[in-house]
């Protein structure tokens, strides 16, 4: 299984390719160009996806309040214009046909720490990002 993971931030879109054991096979980043708006960001992400073959899943971590079940940015600040209401999951899935999962960036960081990092094996912890 090959998983293409994205972290959409205000400055960079960071991405990496992982295998089924979550080994990082490669990574890179491109400028977000947030001032161009949410649709432009999703188009940049899709452009990256289209450079790869054999991707089984896509994971997207993004700033803002996220409805992770539906993959929608429920609320975002003005740092990324026209990002509130962006249907990230359906936009990517409709264009690529690849199952896509979307989560808030802080929740994603906490999940990473719980499974692979400082909180591994701990029942309770707090993840604070600034």
List PLM regions with ranges.
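Glycine-rich phosphate-binding loop and adjoining helix at the ATP-binding site
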Residues: 38-46, 57-58, 66-124
């Amino acid at each position: 299984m090959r998983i293409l993971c994205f972290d959409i931030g205000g400055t960079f879109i960071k991405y990496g390719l992982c295998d089924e054991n979550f080994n990082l096979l490669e990574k890179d980043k491109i400028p977000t160009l947030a001032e161009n708006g949410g649709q432009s960001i999703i188009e940049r992400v899709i452009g990256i996806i289209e450079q790869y073959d054999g991707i089984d899943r896509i994971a997207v971590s993004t700033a803002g309040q996220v409805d992770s079940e539906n993959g929608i940015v429920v609320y975002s600040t003005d740092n990324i214009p026209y990002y509130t209401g962006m249907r990230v999951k359906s936009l990517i899935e409709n264009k690529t046909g690849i199952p896509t999962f979307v989560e808030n960036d802080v929740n994603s960081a906490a999940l990473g720490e719980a499974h692979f990092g400082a909180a591994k094996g701990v029942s309770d912890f707090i993840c604070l990002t600034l």
